């Protein structure tokens, strides 16, 4: 079973070149915070009434104008996300217009709004990939975690329709105490459907939705998160590959340049950006949005230059730079700021989780083998 997407060498080359040149190769447009589900751990979700009380949504004309400006600046890869992007009133016009620009477009969706009519339309402007969230293996779990008593039925139908239409699907699983018992069945579902399933047991604190949630979420304890990280490795990798890990967290085959504890080590703010539903450009979607320039009120290139400068100025905890686990922990700037409220304090939850991994890997090995 493939557990992570395979990135072509040409794509990696483009990212390296764009990082060196400061070109915004990759972008994310967060079209709306509105979602028809209410997942307990979500960092952005608002109801329609909550969204309207804050600000109106930007329309297709504005998003397409932004898309053209981003393309002119070098953007080639684009992720459309939300909330649930299919709930944007002009989502079809947005996707069709961006598709005509020749972009490699991926779409994040919970899958519940994708039916035969939607798939017939998508076949005319197909994304290169649909990233579908899989939150459980039963309608009961979806109701418990997401407040949707028909969620699993809807999502599995969407996945079947997308596959039949020849549209690539990747499954993302956010694992929490509310759906952990379903993990074996979710892995089995992915295997039977020959799909990538990427399991995350670390949940970012939802500080964008509630500033009082620094260091908190509806999530596992650090030790539980480490256990389920190891358990997910066992289920997805298989016995032999799991044992070859010897309790070590796999290191990326092509790690990012830079060093954690120094500056931002990922591509955020170097060759990638995120635009929130209110128009704030940020290095990534987990950063506090009020700090980012508004791309609907200033030229795209000016906003990008500001984000690059702000990102370059970020310095992470020096303790992380000297930590023996830094290459496997990969505590990014977003983790640091959402766990601690600033960039110079160690993200204790993440730190505890990573340092607990070996003992929890041993526990999984003992239980499973």
Cite the ranges covered by each PLM segment.
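Short loop/turn motifs at secondary-structure junctions
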Residues: 38, 74-75, 126, 167-168, ...
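Residue-level signal for the nucleotide or nucleotide-sugar donor/cofactor binding architecture
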Residues: 58, 89, 150, 178-181, ...
